[in-house]
Amino acid sequence: MTSGILIASNVLLWGAFLALAALMLGVIRQIGLLHERSAPLGAMMIDHGPDVGERSPIFNVNTFDGEPVLVGRSITPGRPSLLMFTGPSCPICQKLLPIIRSVAAIEETDVILISDGTQAEHRQFLKDHPLDGELYVVSAEIGMRYQVSKVPYGVLLDQDGKILAKGLCNTREHVESLFETIREGHSTLQNYLKDENTAPKFKQVTANKVH
């Protein structure tokens, strides 16, 4: 009799524990969705690396295909460069790749994808997402010098290697904001939104976009 009661109580306790665990997972998921929906409309600076207005450090590296490239200066003379820090296992980076290509083509900007990880991961990434004019560089050093802690993260350089804008890029609006802030005469999204003349226009434009 006593053993039966103990077994029943244990079953009830485990049932309550599993129900509580399922409830907590649901709450965590909802918090994540809320955080995503409330994310800033533009690329936000979260690193402590080289500042906007400074010239980028120079890195003599090779692309994943073994071609030498000078990261930190223009790839094509007279054209700006977008350094996009990514990861082979980053789903947002994979989703953002065609958007980066589209925006870069409109802005006539060269793209350098900078990543880290194992050779096998990069081979699989490039197999699933073939390059289309971008350079692909595997270098932990560049990310460390820029102190990038989250990806995808973009750094826009002018033709002389000066940092024009930078920030976390999770959406098309984030990528576009790197260029938009410069056109409006601001170095960062934060300064752009502080401007009483440009902030309302920026918010109106992003509100009218269809996602």
UniProtKB/Swiss-Prot annotation:
It is found in: Membrane. The keyword Coiled coil does not apply. GO terms for cellular component: membrane. May be specifically involved in the processing, transport, and/or maturation of the MADH beta-subunit. InterPro entries: MeN_DH_accessory (IPR013478), Thioredoxin-like_fold (IPR012336), Thioredoxin-like_sf (IPR036249), Thioredoxin_domain (IPR013766). This is Methylamine utilization protein MauD. It is a single-pass membrane protein. Residues 50-187 form the Thioredoxin domain. One of its GO terms (biological process) is methylamine metabolic process. The keyword Transmembrane applies. Its main location: membrane. Keywords: Membrane, Transmembrane, Transmembrane helix. PROSITE patterns: THIOREDOXIN_2 (PS51352). Disulfide bonds: none annotated. It comes from the Bacteria. CDD domains: mauD. The chain crosses the membrane at residues 5-25. Pathway: One-carbon metabolism; methylamine degradation. It holds the Pfam family Thioredoxin_2.
